[in-house]
Amino acid sequence: MPGFAALRLIWEPRMLSILRIMVGVLYTEHGLAKMVDFPHQPNHAPYALFTLVPGLQGLLEVVGGLLLALGLFTRTVAFILAGNMAVAYFMAHTPRGFFPLLNGGELVIVYCFIFLYFW
C-alpha cells in the first residue's frame, strides 16, 4: 500500500487542477450574470457592458475565469484577479460594514485568497 507521500504526489496536481477549473467556471458564471443576466437572478438587472466599474468587473470575470479554467496564463490571470477582488471588496463591501459576513464580502475574500494561491 502506498504511503501518504506517494498518494500526495499522485493526487495533489489533480486536485489543484480540479480546483482551478471549478473556480474558473464559477467565476465566469458570476461575470455572465453581471453582463448578460445568465443565469437569471431575481431582482437583478445586467450592468451596462462597458461602464467603468461593473461592466469592467463583469468583463474581467468572464475573460479571467475562462483563462483560468483553461489553464492559460494562470499565474498572471490569478494575480490580476486577486487584485481585482481586493479592490472590489474595499469599494463595494467595506462601506456596508466591517465584518465580511455582514457586508456580503466573504465570497470576494475567498476568491481573492484562492487567486493568490494560484499566483
Question: Over which residues does each language-model region extend?
Answer:
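Extended, low-polarity transmembrane helix blocks
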Residues: 1-36, 54-59, 63, 70-119
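Membrane-interface interhelical connector segments
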Residues: 35-54
